[in-house]
Regions:
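Hydrophobic/aromatic-rich core segments of domains that either
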Residues: 264-336
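A short, highly charged nucleic-acid-interacting micro-segment common to nuclease
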Residues: 252-266
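Solvent-exposed soluble domains appended to multi-pass membrane proteins
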Residues: 182, 186, 222-223, 327-336, ...
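Hydrophobic alpha-helical membrane-insertion segments, chiefly the h-region
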Residues: 18-28
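Intrinsically disordered, low-complexity N-terminal segments that are enriched in acidic
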Residues: 27-171
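N-terminal Sec-pathway targeting helices
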Residues: 2-17
Length: 346
């Protein structure tokens, strides 16, 4: 303080320099953020055929793939309830299978797999929720919850050791479907299909990949509403039926029919539109690198253009952090988000 009193001019000069440097750094950052690798990429024609979505399935081992195909078939055939896996798996394998089932194309808005159990019906995550700590092949059974099941609102009961004590009752309630609810699922599938076709009809036939991306993002911005913190609403839910109706419903392509979607829902809609427009696209999950050590789960959509992989923020929820950019290079994306490490994304 005494120095400042004695050297007012020097102190003022230092303050001016600091302000100028700060302004320069801020200007440089804005300039860098405004320059997009995406803008520099050459336009590229779209494919003529619908792109197959097998990014995750193609990375599964034979063992994991067998369980994946089994669960996918049960889901599509609406065979809910307790299911015994063809191949017992460890925690990492289970997570890879469930992730592939969740992200791989099919619009399973009406159901999901959960409650991994041992052969003796013990819920393996009863005490410790970290599935990756399960290193032995002890996951032999799971439960497929379907919104059309008569007993979808039944709650599980657990013994002190984690055994599902009312599993027989759960199985009976989840293995029988209500015809009216099945009809509702089929109706919504048709409505979703019609909406996807309507969106694609607005895309010029001669448009390239970049033009298609811009069109899909603009459509989502103008026609969909973001569901704020859907996961937070899980508090107070009594059963899996509540989860399906109030949270899970917004995580799928079928959320088009409600004009509301979560970050995951936006990403799935965008990728599905890309596939139908002849463009390879897959979801990339990870942890967003926020400030002060904070992190949250987030989703990008990866699209191949001009020999590079572009990462698209379909929901636009990180618009402010990204300086208004919606399409990032791989380097930019990895600087912003730590990709999940149980699949290969490069």
């Amino acid at each position: 303080m005494n120095y400042i009193r004695k050297h007012k001019k020097a102190a003022l000069l230092i303050a001016v320099v600091v302000v100028v440097l700060f302004a320069f750094v801020t200007w440089q950052r804005k300039l860098t953020m405004s320059k997009s690798v995406y803008d520099e990429l050459k336009e590229e024609p779209r494919g003529e055929a619908v792109e197959k979505d097998d990014f995750y399935y193609s990375q599964l081992t034979a063992k994991e793939g067998e369980d994946f195909l089994f669960l996918k078939e049960q889901m599509e055939n609406l065979n809910g309830g307790v299911l015994e896996l063809p191949q017992p798996v460890n925690g990492k394998e289970y997570q890879r299978i469930i992730t592939a089932l969740e992200y791989e194309g099919a619009d399973n808005f009406y159901g999901f797999v959960d409650i991994p159990m041992t052969e003796d019906n013990v819920y393996v995550l009863y005490e410790d929720k970290d599935v990756f700590k399960i290193t032995e092949d002890k996951i032999s059974k799971v439960i497929l919850f379907l919104s059309c099941a008569e007993g979808i609102h039944l709650s599980g009961e657990f013994a002190e050791d984690g055994m599902v004590s009312n599993l027989e009752k759960i199985q009976k309630g989840l293995s029988v479907n209500e015809e009216e609810k099945v009809a509702e699922i089929e109706k919504r599938q048709k409505e979703t299909e019609a909406l996807l076709e309507e969106i694609l009809q607005g895309l010029p036939a001669d448009s390239g990949k970049k033009e298609a991306i811009d069109y899909f993002l603009r459509w989502l911005d103008e026609n969909m509403e973001f569901v704020q913190k859907a996961a937070a609403t899980t508090e107070g839910m009594q059963n899996m039926g509540d989860m399906l109706e109030k949270v899970y419903d917004f995580n799928h392509v079928a959320s088009l029919t409600k004009k509301k979607a979560s970050t995951l829902g936006y990403a799935k809609i965008f990728s599905e539109l890309c596939h139908r427009a002849g463009m390879e696209s897959h979801l990339v999950m990870g942890s967003w690198n926020g400030g002060w050590g904070q992190s949250e789960m987030y989703i990008f959509c990866a699209v191949s253009i001009d020999g590079q992989t572009v990462y698209v923020d379909a929901s636009g929820q990180k618009n402010a952090s990204l300086g208004g950019k919606r399409c990032l290079s791989e380097k930019e994306a990895k600087n912003r988000m730590t990709f999940a490490d149980y699949f290969e994304y490069s």
